[in-house]
Structures are given as C-alpha cells and as structure tokens.
Amino acid sequence: MAEVRDMLRGLGLRPELIGRAETLRRLPVLEGGERPAGALLHRDAIVHHDAVLHAYRAAARKLGVRLMEGIEALAVLANAGKVEGLRSGAGDILAPVVVNAAGGWSGAFSAKAGVRIPNTPLRREALVTEAAQPFMRAAITFYRPREGWFNQTLRGELVAGCLAPAEEPGVNLAATALSLGRTARTILAKAPRLGQLRVVRQWAGVYDMTPDRKPLVGPVARLQGFVQANGCNGRGFLLGPLIGELLARWLDSGERPPLLAGFDADRFDGREDAKVEAGDYYAGYAAGGQRG
C-alpha cells in the first residue's frame, strides 16, 4: 500500500490509508477475500456516462451548437498548410479549425490530416451482472499484481473490469470468453460472496493510449487550424470536461492555459513511431509522480 500511497501523493492526491478492520467495516463484501486493505479517496465519484452525455447534448443545443450524430468524418480539407474544413458522410463542412477528439480513432483521423501521432488504440473489456440489493457504495480499484475495478450501480448491477497486460494494440471491439473468465476469477478472489451473481452482459471498447500516458492537447505546427484533444489513456471521461474548457479558452484567446503546458500536441514530432506499452497501466502514473 505504501507504493500506491506514494504514487497518489505524487499526483497531488491525499489518500487515507485504511487497514483490514476498517476496510471490512466499510465494505463487508470483501470478507474472505485476499488482502482487504486500501487507500480511500474521499473526493472520487462514479457518474453514469449516458446521463452526462445527455446533459452535454442538451446544453450544447441550447447554445446553438449543431450536432451531427452518426456521420463519419472522412477527411480534413486543407490548402497551403491551413485547414479549410472537414469532409463528412453528409458533405463538406467549411471551417478554419478542426478539433481531433476521436478517442481511440484519433491516430487514424490525425493521419487523414497528414499529421502522424503515436496514439495507439488498446482494447479494454467490462461486464455487468444481474441486479442485487445494495451491498457497496464505494467503487473499488486494485493495482498489482492484477489490475481492475468493480462497483455497484444505483440499479443494483455490479460492473467490473480486469486489465489484460498482454493485450494486442488495435481497434478490436469483440468481447471474449478469456476476458470474462479472467475478470470473474480476479473479482472473486477479492470478494468471494459475489460468486452468486450472474453475468448478463459483456462489452469491449478502446483506450486511446500515448507512449508517456499523457494527453495531446492543442494546435499542431504542421497544419494551421488542426487541433488535438486526445490521448487520454482511458481517462477521457474524467479529463474531457476540463480539457474542453481549457482548450476552448485557448482557441478563443490565442493563449495556452498554463495547465496545458505539459501536454503539447507536437511533443512527439520526430518520434511518431514511439511505442505504447500495453502492460502495467499505472506504471506511467507512478513514474510521473516520482518525477514530480
């Protein structure tokens, strides 16, 4: 736990370390599982992605934003080193700025603009069980030797995932029996009581990974008007609102907010072939915390 504590403190967080007795008092579901101790983060929370997206959609429309859902972005229109717009499945859209916020597809989309970046999509899977009476309020994440997480929704389902350290990079949205078994075994080692729950759904998505585990945010030098907002390494839902706010301020004023100084969109120029390590997810954060 000291390693996790030091990593979190290096990131500016203030975790409360709790031992076996306090952990089991807060989370009886862990009774009988391995190593019931933890670091408590009081300010963390779980929110439902659909509800958040609905709220953002409604707010954007009130501001007059035109949303074109389900339309593929085919190419970036450019001339003389400047963006002129976007070619979409619904026709050309003229604009002096195009923001690449394509998540796991950001590397491929950036290439359409002639700007290579080392972003690499990496599959992650999750599962959800049938609903049960409330048995836990906190979300649980665990780190080394196995990494994963689980929490209970307001409707009573258990949602869980366990990372595969040897996952092959690339866009792959297929859910696998291998992941199902690995996740079930790992979660049951932590909370044996959950073995009575039945899995009802499983799915896969992709993380947008960068070699240094940091986002790419801001305009690029090679193509005026092309802006990166990607590479969130599986934390886009957390980072997206702040990145959006700071990036909008930057594009409006022409001045980069100090908080974005460490995420320069051109920092991999000349190193576009830098590799993403698919292993230990938190290793990049641990190293970053030690450096900071």
Label every PLM stretch briefly.
Residues 1-26, 147-149, 186-188:
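Dinucleotide-binding Rossmann-like beta1-alpha1 core, especially the glycine-rich loop
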Residues 19, 69-71, 201:
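Short loop/edge segments at beta-strand edges and connector loops
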Residues 27-35, 77-84, 134, 209-213, ...:
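A short, glycine/Asx- and small/polar-enriched loop/turn
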Residues 38-59, 103-105, 179-186, 232, ...:
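Mid-domain beta-loop-alpha active-site segment that forms a flexible
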Residues 39-97:
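Helical element adjacent to the flavin cofactor pocket in flavoenzyme catalytic cores
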Residues 88-137, 173:
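Central helical "cap/lid" subdomain
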Residues 131-228:
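Active-site lid/adjacent beta-loop-alpha segment flanking the redox-cofactor pocket in flavoenzymes
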Residues 188-292:
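C-terminal catalytic lobe of FAD-dependent flavoproteins
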